[in-house]
Amino acid sequence: MPATISRAAYADMYGPTTGDKVRLADTDLIIEVERDLTTYGEEVKFGGGKVIRDGMGQSQATRAEGAVDTVITNALIVDHTGIYKADVGLRDGVIAAIGKAGNPDTQTGVDIIIGPGTEAIAGEGRILTAGGFDSHIHFICPQQIEDALHSGITTMIGGGTGPAHGSLATTCTPGAFHIGRMLQSLDAFPMNFGLAGKGNASRPGALVEMIEAGACAMKLHEDWGTTPGAIDCCLSVADDMDVQVMIHTDTLNESGFVENTIAAMKGRTIHAFHTEGAGGGHAPDIMKVVGFEHVLPSSTNPTMPYTVNTLEEHLDMLMVCHHLDKAIPEDVAFAESRIRKETIAAEDILHDMGAFSIIASDSQAMGRVGEVIIRTWQTADKMKKQRGRLAEETGDNDNFRVRRYIAKYTINPAIAHGISAHIGSIEVGKRADLCLWNPAFFGVKPEMILMGGTIVCAQMGDPNASIPTPQPVYTRPMFGAYGRSVENSAVLFVSQAGQAAGIGASLGLAKQTLAVKTCRDIGKSSMVHNSATPEVEVHPETYEVRADGELLTCEPATELPLAQRYFMF
């Protein structure tokens, strides 16, 4: 006889199902389960007296007969593709199937075969997301990687060689020698990486050399001279070799204004960093580029969201990052020209409209590497409080807004950098770089992080305790973060030219190298849930921002979610 239980009892046992709602941490964001791919009465769950036992939910199938390596049961998936419940099967480090797990000998409709060789991760009452992708990294110190990983980031792309002054200010790994040494170093960490070469040159030879050495992107930075000639040259090389170009434009307008930079792009695809301008770029109107189809605009996280403290912290931050001197009036004027409350306020709104497509950190160079995910959801919450329900919502929930914001640090940077075939979403065939979250800690502290299907860190209690839960519980590295597992769980993203040249073998790299592809034949319309192209105008004296004629302004937040109550110890 079928049994009937209350929704509350069902959610406690198997997690929320279709129509149930979940609050994300202490925000005002409410998601609703859109569909449930498991089968009522045939759910699989691990534990004493539960379903995944021999002859019940566990079959006799060998791995060769199709059993998965790992099953994540009854997880609530939050992804740009939707918000739904499913079992997820992992095999060979990738997502093998999404649907209903179990034993096909005793159950119908089984998509994921559980066998004696299958490990189980309990996803009941948990949220599963794709690992985050931070596409604006200054590789200043290796300790960044641990902080990023523990926040839910599983892929980092950027440039640098350590605390050299070029790297402190610019996101570039210049030259084949440094690219090689950095790739060799990055073999050691449980994280996917890619390196950006220096793109500032008026002739192509050195740029080609860096891409052939493995650089998967090129970075144009004003501190190296982002002139129209350098922009044109770099984009020409990128078009020929299929890598992305990231740009930090000319704050001082020395070599031209924003219109000259746009003209130099000639309609070619480019990833515009910190497009609001506080992180650098044509003052005061770099934000105009948001309205162009060929520009993929991103934000760095210190201005996100706009709060009562944002302006005050930025001047000192900028002076340090760009090697400026408070005793030199011109340096002070340079710094002050970049910090504008009007454009910072408008940035929040443009994100909520889907006109800004990506959020990244700018790690240790006017950005916080461990706060990409936190600040994304703080911004989403602030915008819901200030702007209300999005017009695109179809139910009594915030599902569309949540899908828009999660795309900003998952699928959209992956598309921009030619690696969306491998990462950026929970889809069959993609790498199993995944984050499992307790909803009460969503966006703040992941419960478990997998790289290539292997657990690399998790919330863990006292190792000497009799059970795993006694305090102090905090994020600790797991077995996947040690030994040979590291090199087999994570990958290095390189150029197609570098891959063809066999740089993995020539540099003695242990990690698999994967080539970036389709970086050039994309545009703003490729940015999932974030493809709006309003005509943006910035008043040259008041700095007021208008989008399609509408004034964009909002109040600074005085209090944020995902903040102090989560970091008392």
From Swiss-Prot:
Pfam families named in the record: Amidohydro_1, Urease_alpha
GO CC terms of this entry: cytoplasm
Reactions accelerated catalytically: urea + 2 H2O + H(+) = hydrogencarbonate + 2 NH4(+)
Keyword Cytoplasm: yes
Localization per Swiss-Prot or TrEMBL: Cytoplasm
Cofactor(s) required, per the database record: Ni cation
Modification(s) after translation: Carboxylation allows a single lysine to coordinate two nickel ions.
Keywords, ordered alphabetically: Cytoplasm, Hydrolase, Metal-binding, Nickel
BP-aspect Gene Ontology terms: urea catabolic process
Biological or metabolic pathway of the protein: Nitrogen metabolism; urea degradation; CO(2) and NH(3) from urea (urease route): step 1/1
Record-listed substrate binding positions: H221
Active site as annotated: H322 (proton donor)
Keyword Metal-binding in annotation: yes
GO molecular function, one term: nickel cation binding
Record EC number: 3.5.1.5
Residue numbers bearing the N6-carboxylysine modification: K219
Binding-site residues, Ni(2+) 1: H136, H138, K219, D362
Cofactor note: Binds 2 nickel ions per subunit.
Residues holding Ni(2+) 2: K219, H248, H274
SUPFAM superfamilies the record matches: Composite domain of metallo-dependent hydrolases (SSF51338), Metallo-dependent hydrolases (SSF51556)
Similarity annotation: Belongs to the metallo-dependent hydrolases superfamily. Urease alpha subunit family.
Oligomer status and interactors: Heterotrimer of UreA (gamma), UreB (beta) and UreC (alpha) subunits. Three heterotrimers associate to form the active enzyme.
Name of protein: Urease subunit alpha
Top-level taxonomy: Bacteria, Pseudomonadati, Pseudomonadota, Alphaproteobacteria, Rhodobacterales
